[in-house]
Amino acid sequence: MRKVKSARKLGRTASHRKATLANLSTQLLLHKRIETTEAKAKETRKHVEKIITKAKKGTVHAQRIIFKTIRDKSAIRELFEDIIGRIGDRNGGYTRIIKLAPRYGDAAKMAVIELVDYAEMPAEQPKAATTDRSKRVKGSKKKAVAEGTSAE
């Protein structure tokens, strides 16, 4: 009897989806926080939580299994040396998804996925607010306006 698969397709072929999740997982392990669409963040969460749980065993066998999906040695080194040490005795729930405003170009639902124990890391600095240039009056216009009101 046919059963429904629980994973999202993300509008990709199976190989493309597998590569996308591997890349997102690698970047999350390296940078501790990434911004992506909400659907990709939810799938990445499932993927990364399983990887971290396997890595907590700390065996060579666990490293080899994880290396099948995450093909970046620096990410695996970071996982086994730094991330596992910070996680400690936490039983699951290693990641957090924070929803953001929709993306400007296509209104896609955006989210930030981050490792929970790295939340105190400084977020990207917000860009300086730009002034509204439509309200500014240039010097020559100021003089003309001032002269026009004083003449009346």
From Swiss-Prot:
Region of interest called Disordered, as start-end residue ranges on this chain: 124-152
GO annotation terms (biological process): translation
A molecular function (GO) term: structural constituent of ribosome
Signal peptide limits: none
PROSITE patterns cross-referenced by the UniProt entry: RIBOSOMAL_L17
SUPFAM superfamilies (UniProt xref): Prokaryotic ribosomal protein L17
Any one of the GO CC terms: cytosolic large ribosomal subunit
Record flagged with keyword Ribosomal protein: yes
A Pfam family assignment: Ribosomal_L17
Keywords associated with the record: Ribonucleoprotein, Ribosomal protein
This protein's record includes keyword Ribonucleoprotein: yes
Domain of life of the native organism: Bacteria
NCBIfam families: L17 (TIGR00059)
Quaternary structure, from the entry: Part of the 50S ribosomal subunit. Contacts protein L32.
Family in the record: Belongs to the bacterial ribosomal protein bL17 family.
HAMAP family membership: Ribosomal_bL17 (MF_01368)
Protein name: Large ribosomal subunit protein bL17
Gene designation per UniProt: rplQ
